[in-house]
Amino acid sequence: MGATGDAEQPRGPSGAERGGLELGDAGAAGQLVLTNPWNIMIKHRQVQRRGRRSQMTTSFTDPAISMDLLRAVLQPSINEEIQTVFNKYMKFFQKAALNVRDNVGEEVDAEQLIQEACRSCLEQAKLLFSDGEKVIPRLTHELPGIKRGRQAEEECAHRGSPLPKKRKGRPPGHILSSDRAAAGMVWKPKSCEPIRREGPKWDPARLNESTTFVLGSRANKALGMGGTRGRIYIKHPHLFKYAADPQDKHWLAEPHHMRATGGKMAYLLIEEDIRDLAASDDYRGCLDLKLEELKSFVLPSWMVEKMRKYMETLRTENEHRAVEAPPQT
């Protein structure tokens, strides 16, 4: 029996091969030695995983990537809350769209008008998270052309009030920076931009029934700014632009000069002004010019008369403001 037991002892390693544990020598009786290759593989894989985690940590130190990962996680919840807000005001958009369809005609797509209005709301909401230095010049360019009469004056006074507060709150060394000084030099002419609305281009006599006009959206594309809606009004605030009222837009939609836009703003520009800009040094040789986008047209006498009065109002307003400016300072 003893010989048989000695003969069967070499079969012990096969137990280790099957996944068992191999005992140590007699002096180390009771201790387990982890010589199983499977255990070695587990330890090796754990080291590799730790290595991967460390690599991922170092590759995600970019702030933009980290913030975008967080945004991706929160985006579904944000979208749900945004949808809840729009559902709250959807009844107003629906009533307005149906009213537009009743006034303009059945060819108006009410659902499309609602979608465009919602997208416009989201675009305007972006301004809540814009840098203050970028938003203020934009408002300075856009508001004088959109607001009329006393509204423009009140808005200009409202915009001018925060400026002294910013100067008082900043340390003197911050203002003496060369970049800030250059920006300040540009800011002053922009704030006084409405005074430049004079001269031959702002003479109402130049408007008659043979004057050709273009849509502001087409002028934007013709000057190579098609990707940014309304950029032409920001870059060239001195241009005369006329905001079409519902009666004007109804006439424009009938000859198919423009689509029925409902409540969306539609501006008319003088074709001659746009072509003069295209021939100026700022655009001469520009590869993005697409003057074929200028689909010009003439307007009826009643609409031209409204545009003359509007131009005269702006000229008179600017002349009064230029006279009243010295006593205010």
Swiss-Prot record:
Region annotated Important for DNA and nucleosome binding, chain positions: 197-316
Pfam families: DNTTIP1_dimer, TdIF1_2nd
Main location as per UniProt: nucleus
DNA-binding region residue numbers: 159-173, 216-237
Coiled-coil region(s): none
Residue numbers of Phosphoserine PTMs: S161
Chain intervals with Basic and acidic residues compositional bias: 147-158
Subcellular location: Nucleus
Region Important for dimerization, residue ranges: 56-147
Segments carrying motif Nuclear localization signal: 164-170
UniProt subunit comment: Monomer and homodimer. A minor proportion may form homotrimers. Interacts with ZNF541. Interacts with the terminal deoxynucleotidyltransferase DNTT. Interacts with TRERF1. Identified in a histone deacetylase complex that contains DNTTIP1, HDAC1 and MIDEAS; this complex assembles into a tetramer that contains four copies of each protein chain. Component of a histone deacetylase complex containing DNTTIP1, ZNF541, HDAC1 and HDAC2. Identified in a complex with KCTD19, HDAC1, HDAC2 and ZNF541.
Role according to the record: Increases DNTT terminal deoxynucleotidyltransferase activity (in vitro). Also acts as a transcriptional regulator, binding to the consensus sequence 5'-GNTGCATG-3' following an AT-tract. Associates with RAB20 promoter and positively regulates its transcription. Binds DNA and nucleosomes; may recruit HDAC1 complexes to nucleosomes or naked DNA.
Domain comment quoted from the record: The N-terminal domain mediates dimerization.
Name of this protein: Deoxynucleotidyltransferase terminal-interacting protein 1
Gene assigned in the entry: DNTTIP1
